[in-house]
């Protein structure tokens, strides 16, 4: 069984036991997070498609880690003008482990 959930403006295909990195959530390591914006549920030969979300379906996940991605270097340059700007950015993320998928009745 798998589900497609929406969080942080992105969509993720999840199943029980899978881990995923999502945009940073306000939760501590070890906390349980409920993702209730389920777009699609697939099990055996049956598929439930939400309009836009599947009513009553949710994913229960545990926060495994709060961290940042590796640094991305941004370098701006204009030739002949001696203009150079260099800066870096590290995007924060939350790593989740899926514990349970709750289906609608």
Curated annotation (Swiss-Prot):
GO BP: any one term: translation
GO CC terms, sorted: cytoplasm; ribonucleoprotein complex; ribosome
UniProt KW keywords: Ribonucleoprotein, Ribosomal protein, RNA-binding, rRNA-binding
InterPro entries, alphabetized: bL21-like, bL21-like_sf, Ribosomal_bL21, Ribosomal_bL21_CS
Record has RNA-binding as a keyword: yes
Gene Ontology MF: a single term: rRNA binding
Pfam family, one: Ribosomal_L21p
Keyword presence, Coiled coil: no
Domain of life: Bacteria
PROSITE patterns: RIBOSOMAL_L21
Assembly description: Part of the 50S ribosomal subunit. Contacts protein L20.
Function text: This protein binds to 23S rRNA in the presence of protein L20.
The family this protein is said to belong to: Belongs to the bacterial ribosomal protein bL21 family.
Cited PANTHER family: 50S RIBOSOMAL PROTEIN L21, LARGE RIBOSOMAL SUBUNIT PROTEIN BL21M
Name of the protein in question: Large ribosomal subunit protein bL21
Organism for this UniProt entry: Dictyoglomus thermophilum (strain ATCC 35947 / DSM 3960 / H-6-12)
């Amino acid at each position: 069984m798998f589900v497609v959930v929406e969080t942080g403006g992105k969509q993720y295909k999840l199943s029980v036991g899978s881990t995923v990195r999502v945009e940073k959530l306000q939760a501590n390591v070890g906390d349980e997070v409920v993702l209730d914006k389920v777009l699609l549920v697939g099990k055996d030969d049956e598929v439930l498609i939400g309009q836009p979300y599947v009513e009553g379906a949710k994913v229960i996940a545990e926060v495994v880690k709060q961290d940042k991605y590796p640094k991305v270097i941004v370098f701006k340059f204009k030739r002949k003008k001696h203009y150079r700007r260099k800066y870096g950015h590290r995007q924060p993320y939350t790593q989740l482990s899926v514990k349970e998928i709750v289906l609608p009745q």
